């Protein structure tokens, strides 16, 4: 299955996902981009290599059909499609000039009186250090339920796949812990397992829960997998002190799951092939410092 898209059948079954929207995403990569950017810093943009397109899905469970329903949105990652539904999506760059970027997305809905649904999406565009932990602040006395996590499945290992021992990356769900002031999801550290299920480049993970308090401005804390200090990013969370809104909104809009990231070299004008919720296996080209070469 090397160099192919791998998804859970249950994620693309139309009957099991009523109302779902599907997007195919492509990354257009050039081995020479980093070198060119080093000599042309004022002209370089290493963050416009992604494009996406919406598709409808039919068929299953053995064969699926993907039909485009809109034109390609060029030079933007697919998480930006979520912003069109009312979500907030922000770009984060922990080490400008030395590493890539990731995106923090979030949306809060009020599906019934006294219940608020919190959805968070973390997308690693080209951040070599990867993401290992995500923590959301909670107010005193907040009751949390329906805690959820979603990550795309990883490919099994194969010879010279670039992972430690050719074992492939782990697909183990992240651990979740809660105390009086926060809820935290995390995978193993790099020191514990170099093949841990970190959020690597071109991959999006989802986190969610319900709470009995309305949203307030807060900070989430993200810890990185390979290197770097923790980073705080603005979100909304049930931190307390707000006035509950009695009018419920529609049921919670599902966060986009990880989108396909083929690694073919092309110009950004190419139309990405429909690919649901994949997990890219090869390492990214340098973003923007030299990193080990992509594995086959």
Predicted regions and their residues:
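Low-complexity, intrinsically disordered segments enriched in Ser/Thr together with acidic residues
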Residues: 1-16, 184-217, 224
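Solvent-exposed beta-hairpin/edge-strand motifs
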Residues: 133-166
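Beta-strand elements of well-folded, non-transmembrane domains
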Residues: 28-32, 124-126, 211
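Short beta-strand elements
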Residues: 30-88, 232-242
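Serine/threonine-rich, low-complexity linker/repeat segments that form flexible spacers/stalks
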Residues: 81-118
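Short beta-strand elements of extracellular/lumenal beta-sandwich folds
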Residues: 106-128, 132, 138
């Amino acid at each position: 299955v090397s160099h192919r898209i791998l998804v859970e059948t249950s994620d693309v079954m139309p009957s099991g996902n009523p109302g779902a929207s599907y997007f195919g995403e492509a990354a257009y990569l050039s081995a020479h981009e980093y070198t060119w950017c080093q000599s042309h810093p004022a002209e370089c943009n290493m963050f416009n290599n992604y494009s996406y397109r919406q598709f409808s899905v039919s068929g299953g469970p053995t064969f699926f059909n993907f039909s485009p329903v809109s034109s390609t949105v060029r030079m933007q990652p697919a998480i930006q499609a979520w912003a069109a539904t009312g979500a907030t999506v922000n770009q984060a760059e922990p080490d400008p000039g030395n590493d890539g970027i990731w995106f923090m997305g979030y949306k809060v809905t009020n599906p019934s009186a006294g219940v608020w649904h919190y959805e968070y999406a973390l997308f690693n565009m080209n951040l070599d250090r990867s993401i290992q932990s995500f923590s959301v602040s909670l107010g005193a006395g907040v009751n949390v339920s329906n805690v959820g996590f979603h990550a795309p499945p990883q490919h099994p290992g194969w010879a010279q796949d670039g992972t430690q021992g050719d074992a492939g990356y782990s697909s183990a769900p992240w651990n979740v812990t809660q105390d009086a002031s926060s809820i935290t999801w995390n995978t193993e550290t790099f020191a514990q397992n170099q093949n841990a299920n970190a959020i690597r480049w071109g991959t999006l993970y989802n986190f969610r829960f319900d709470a009995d308090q309305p949203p307030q401005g807060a900070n989430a804390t993200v810890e990185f997998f390979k290197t770097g200090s923790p980073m705080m990013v603005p979100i909304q969370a049930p931190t307390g002190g707000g006035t509950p809104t009695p009018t419920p909104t529609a049921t919670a809009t599902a966060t986009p799951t990880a989108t396909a990231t083929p690694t073919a070299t092309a110009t950004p004008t190419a139309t990405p092939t429909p690919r649901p919720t994949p997990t890219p296996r090869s390492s990214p080209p340098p973003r923007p410092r030299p990193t080990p070469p992509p594995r086959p």
